[in-house]
């Protein structure tokens, strides 16, 4: 059996880039909660002792940007300079302006267009991906890297590993077998964790705790063997972290947000963007499309692409590739996808209920992945029944 290795990485919520994603989405939630028609393009950057939110927002909502920044930093665990940022003492800069009137007239006609006539907020192409290798219909390498990162945060916050600090990165290499286009995981080849820690803990304690409290609960035993390699804090020291260690910026973790390097990516980030931005809503609808193709048994693996022009409601193109795993030809699956999903931005917003903010809805997406999550707020994860005729054996 010929196999190959594939690697996916993740970062947890205390990573500076992810901190910025979460602040941008917390701002989006606050705007949509009060005004579902808010037009939001919110960016965040951070470095030592400073967070800045900037961008274009048109909303009727009354939003305390500084409070959102401090609350988000605090909830992640940035409560002192020792851990990389102090939520209560850091400088918060705000530079928010209104959406460009040129964009507004072209996209939503200054709020006068009907939903079916709302144009895409920008040009671009987005990809959705699904694979039958996990119950989530997501790549195993990505799922494991992401869940290990989430577990790191869990054992930090519940006090199991008191030496942990907010920043951290994970990486998992999986050995795969290609079964006529479908991906079959064989074993976990390598696990890498680099996590921020306090001054008191030894490298031996770090390795022991990570294996016992983080890796064992997440990676199924069937994927681990005596050849699995563990790199646990290989640099030897990771005390300085968060914005104190590295600058952070919204939208720099787009592969972690999606499929861990599998499928494809059009390059657009998600966080801080309202649903007229097809970077986000377009990526959500094609995830639902690809997932539905696989969940309905039409293929074991699927990639769906959609593309747009600014101000134009109808997509320029829709593309489907099942990597040779389809039970019917890809052109027939494409026809079913186009008949079953409405790719116009205004209609995607309605069908996926993307104007509903509040309750940390979009904030939840900004750490540990936008896809493969079992949460009713992730409406794009709902499988749509597709009508098709299964070929007779």
Curated annotation (Swiss-Prot):
One of its GO terms (molecular function) is methionine adenosyltransferase activity. It is found in: Cytoplasm. Mg(2+) binds at residue 9. ATP binds at residues 15, 167-169, 235-238, 246, 252-253, 269, 273, 277. The keyword GTP-binding does not apply. PROSITE patterns: ADOMET_SYNTHASE_1, ADOMET_SYNTHASE_2. Its EC number is 2.5.1.6. Binds 2 divalent ions per subunit. The metal ions interact primarily with the substrate. Can utilize magnesium, manganese or cobalt (in vitro). K(+) binds at residue 43. Keywords: ATP-binding, Cobalt, Cytoplasm, Magnesium, Metal-binding, Nucleotide-binding, One-carbon metabolism, Potassium, Transferase. L-methionine binds at residues 56, 99, 246, 277. InterPro entries: ADOMET_SYNTHASE_CS, S-AdoMet_synt_C, S-AdoMet_synt_central, S-AdoMet_synt_N, S-AdoMet_synthetase, S-AdoMet_synthetase_sfam. GO terms for cellular component: cytoplasm. It holds the Pfam family S-AdoMet_synt_N. GO terms for biological process: one-carbon metabolic process; S-adenosylmethionine biosynthetic process. It catalyses: L-methionine + ATP + H2O = S-adenosyl-L-methionine + phosphate + diphosphate. Its cofactor is Mn(2+); Mg(2+); Co(2+); K(+). It comes from the Eukaryota. The keyword ATP-binding applies. Pathway: Amino-acid biosynthesis; S-adenosyl-L-methionine biosynthesis; S-adenosyl-L-methionine from L-methionine: step 1/1. Homotetramer. Catalyzes the formation of S-adenosylmethionine from methionine and ATP. The reaction comprises two steps that are both catalyzed by the same enzyme: formation of S-adenosylmethionine (AdoMet) and triphosphate, and subsequent hydrolysis of the triphosphate. Belongs to the AdoMet synthase family. HAMAP family: S_AdoMet_synth1. NCBIfam families: metK (TIGR01034). This is S-adenosylmethionine synthase 1.
